[in-house]
Design a protein with these regions (language model features):
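Membrane-embedded helix-loop-helix hairpins and adjacent transmembrane boundary segments
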Residues: 1-493
Length: 493
């Protein structure tokens, strides 16, 4: 049993963080153009890109909140991740050919090709705001872990994380983002496996006792027969699994940008297949980890302190129960989760700002060297903004008292942010790929009605967060197409 963080734990964590910055320094010597900074010269290995896509979507939310969710409730949310391979199939055969057929850097260039520059600008802005909300949450979670470990102010921990990620992303561009994602994925998954092994070792009866306790308390239940629109029903989770995951895989620059870093369309398909197939074993691992934590504290009730919320149960176990040295490795794994998402967001926001705004609307003939310098400065600015927003999220979720303020915590907030801001935008991408008659007027009306409906549902009816993306995509897609059919504006081709 470990009563706290020791010198060896700090050394392990420092070596990991230093290694990530070292990779940034190494790749900084090669980042001499925007083509390399944004796309890795379109020559990245498909398997590394696939792991990077997986890591980008993984985040510390998966590492902390999903085990916490399984600990608190059951496996109902496993269905959500099982829908990702279905989304991968849709994107590979329908969206990817449309994107790869165009020699583009930003996915929002596709929107201009179909609907004009105004829609492109809207899509890019919506992406930026959605990512800022997302990075605030994924930066908050690992900083919470450091708060638990060291007792230092939470805001200081957020600052440390924000600075380190910003530094290596500024230095190395998309290449360092992809290769650090590979390293971070290995560390993160290895850490989860190690934690699960040690939990089972500490329980009399081991793995089979975890199964027994989990079954006795219905922890493996995946289907809830209920009619409430606010519960974790399989109906809402199944619907949300398809539509919510369609948002990042079809319309989010952090993911779609990876498709453009590969050498060919074949490699793009292979990287996407790899990224979605890894989801299945990793999801089973993280949900079982949460059930194992429940079994551990059921058999060792005296070790659980009062007031430890579901979002903090895994970090609490790491700090209190992991052997010296291994605790540092597990904390490094949590850092890997957040850094793999945060670096992707910083680089992609920089890509969008330069490609979709600076070069498109302000200085189209600006030299590549100036654009590269601007991209780095934007990365710094976005890193500062993300850090400030993470402080605000921490104060909100912690309720100002150091305790988690909600039963569902950061995971549900993340889903709500993605559904509310991304659903309507993804619907417009669907209209661009699946129809030819949709035009600018239809897009505008569809986006307005979609946003209005989502706001009403979110603040007026308190429906399940999993319904947000589905409603946003369907309303945006259907309304934009129907309005276009009765309008006289000729769509862009």
């Amino acid at each position: 049993m470990n009563s706290g963080f020791h010198l060896l734990d700090y050394l392990v964590l420092i070596v990991y963080l230093g290694g990530m910055v070292g990779l940034g320094v190494y790749f900084a010597r090669r980042e001499n153009s925007t083509e390399r900074f944004f796309l890795g010269n379109r020559s990245m290995p498909w398997w590394a890109v696939g792991i990077s896509i997986f890591a980008t979507q993984l985040s510390a939310i998966t590492y902390i909140s999903i085990p916490g969710k399984a600990y608190e409730t059951d496996w109902a949310w496993l269905v959500y991740n099982m829908g990702i391979p279905v989304v991968g199939l849709i994107v590979i055969f329908l969206f990817l050919p449309a994107y790869r057929a165009r020699n583009i850097t930003s996915v929002y260039e596709f929107l201009e090709n179909r609907f004009g520059p105004a829609v492109r600008a809207y899509g890019a802005l919506a992406f930026i705001f959605m990512q800022l909300g997302r990075v605030a949450i994924v930066l908050y979670l690992p900083s919470l872990v450091l708060f638990e470990v060291t007792g230092l102010p939470l805001e200081l921990m957020i600052l440390v994380m924000g600075v380190l990620v910003t530094v290596y992303t500024v230095l190395g561009g998309i290449e360092v983002v992809i290769w650090t994602d590979v390293v971070q994925t290995v560390i993160l998954l290895a850490g989860a496996v190690l934690a699960l092994f040690l939990i089972c070792f500490r329980i009399d009866g081991g793995f089979y006792e975890v199964i027994s306790i989990g079954g006795l308390h219905d922890k493996f239940q995946m289907v809830h027969l209920d009619t409430s629109v606010s519960k974790d029903l399989i109906w809402f989770i199944l619907i949300g699994a398809i539509f919510t995951n369609l948002v990042p895989y079809a319309s989010d620059q952090t993911v779609v940008q990876r498709y453009f870093t590969t050498k060919s369309g074949r490699d793009a398909r292979r990287c996407l297949w790899l990224s979605v197939l890894i989801v299945i074993p990793s999801s089973l691992l993280f949900f079982f980890l949460g059930t194992a934590l429940f079994a551990f504290y059921t058999t060792h009730p005296g070790l659980l302190q009062e007031g430890v919320g579901n979002d903090r149960i895994f970090p609490f176990f790491i700090v209190k129960e992991m052997p010296v040295g291994l605790a540092g490795l597990l904390i490094a794994a949590i850092f890997a989760g957040t850094m793999s998402s945060l670096d992707s967001s910083l680089n992609s926001i920089s890509t969008v700002c330069v490609t979709d705004f600076y070069k498109r609307f302000f200085y189209p003939h600006s030299g590549d060297r100036r654009c590269l310098a601007l991209a780095r400065w934007i990365t710094v600015i976005v890193g500062i903004i993300a850090t400030a927003l993470a402080v605000m999220v921490a104060r909100s979720l912690m309720g100002g008292s150091g305790q988690n303020g909600g039963a569902h915590g950061a995971w549900d907030l993340f889903i709500a942010v993605q559904g509310l801001l991304g659903g309507g935008l993804a619907g417009i991408f669907c209209a661009g790929v699946f129809t030819r008659r949709t035009n600018q007027i239809g897009v505008a009306v569809g986006l307005i009605l979609s946003a209005g409906l989502l706001a009403a549902v979110k603040y007026g009816f308190q429906w399940h967060p999993q319904t947000f993306a589905a409603m946003g995509i369907l309303v945006s897609f259907i309304v934009s197409y129907l309005v276009s059919c009765i309008s006289k504006t000729v769509p862009e081709t």
